[in-house]
Amino acid sequence: MIDLRALREDPDRLRASQRARGEDESVVDRLLDLDSRHRAALARFETLRAEQKSVGKSVSRASAEEREALLNRAKSLASEVKSAEAEAEALSDELTTLLRSVPNVVESDAPVGGVDDFVVVEEVGTPRQFDFTPRDHLELGEMLGAIDTERGAKVSGARFYFLTGVGALLELGLLNLAMQRAVANGFTPMIPPVLVKPETMDGTGFLGEHAAEVYHLPADDLYLVGTSEVPLAGYHANEILPADALPTRYIGWSSCFRREAGSYGKDTRGIIRVHQFNKVEMFVYAHPDEAHEEHLRLLAWEREMLDLIEVPYRVVDIAAGDLGTSAARKYDCEAWLPSQGRYRELTSTSNCTEFQSRRLNIRYRDTDGKPRFVATLNGTLATTRWIVAILENHQQEDGSVVVPEALRPFVGQDVLHPIAKK
């Protein structure tokens, strides 16, 4: 949720953010109008309430002649106070609802535009020139006995799969390597619940424009998470953290679930776009003044992991119109996929500033003793999709795949060889 005080002081900043996102600027004027009306209604309620208390005290001291008039006024004030309170509460609810519908204010130097207007920050490595026609990850996965989408569909439906044999070992190796790296960098490992309450899902900003992506269990009124960012953000809801505890860094390992609504016909082959996958996610509570630098650190840790799996990748600065509701700035790392001849996202890291903490009421105690909202940040350190990039970039002509050196202790093999299909 955006900062109402900051909006009053600099409404043009939100207008510029809305323009950059391609969103409606008029919401700024509606917010200011509602805020003004709410404050006026609140002032009227407080004035009437003060008068009501004063009249109540005066009745006991009044003469017989004065008492009747005071009692009549007290009766009238009771009705007026009730009406004024109801008006103030209604305007407060309307203002809060509108505030919660507005996306985070983007950083001023974020690229302007939509999904195709990202800026390439850097390209790392050179896409390999094959002297044979490279196979895609699904063909390789089937040859290696690593991926079984046919039985996944039989058991669960489209966009489900089994990781089998070396496929399971590759994923476990990736996730374990990511956890090891994160712990070495000062993160506390967490295995969070994957079902959360509505207030937690909404507090992180995933029940707005992303609501169609989320699995809901109506009988229990719980939501399946699409990322461990959600439970990790809710972990300190309604708490005040000591300033000297910041940054507080968590690394979460969880299964993730996404409906992939609106993606009909996209990435139907293989395991690039699926309903269930595993992910290791970094999540940080930081001092707002240090959030920008912390964001760059998260990006650097993502890049270290990508360097370890030895695939060509690029870093892109996502345009404002393609940012999620909660993000003020986002960087993606995209790996080269030989079978598609293009880069595909493997990681993302977002600076959500105080947007989520304001919705979840997460604060820190500043040096002056006053509670202030923390900044929250997140970043992917490994996920199932990385297997796609590893198989395709490290494949050999016979269908074998060279295992990146960093993963060999986990997989137990230097090279994965095709097996006879069962």
From Swiss-Prot:
Record field: catalytic activity: tRNA(Ser) + L-serine + ATP = L-seryl-tRNA(Ser) + AMP + diphosphate + H(+); tRNA(Sec) + L-serine + ATP = L-seryl-tRNA(Sec) + AMP + diphosphate + H(+)
Any one cellular-component term (Gene Ontology): cytoplasm
Recorded GO MF terms: ATP binding; serine-tRNA ligase activity
Paired cysteines (S-S): none
GO biological process terms held by the UniProt record: selenocysteine biosynthetic process; seryl-tRNA aminoacylation
Chain residues that bind ATP: R258, R259, E260, V274, E345, L346, T347, S348
UniProt-annotated location(s): Cytoplasm
Keywords from the UniProt entry: Aminoacyl-tRNA synthetase, ATP-binding, Cytoplasm, Ligase, Nucleotide-binding, Protein biosynthesis
HAMAP family: Ser_tRNA_synth_type1
Free-text function comment from the UniProt entry: Catalyzes the attachment of serine to tRNA(Ser). Is also able to aminoacylate tRNA(Sec) with serine, to form the misacylated tRNA L-seryl-tRNA(Sec), which will be further converted into selenocysteinyl-tRNA(Sec).
Subunit structure: Homodimer. The tRNA molecule binds across the dimer.
UniProt name for this protein: Serine--tRNA ligase
Species annotation: Thermobifida fusca (strain YX)
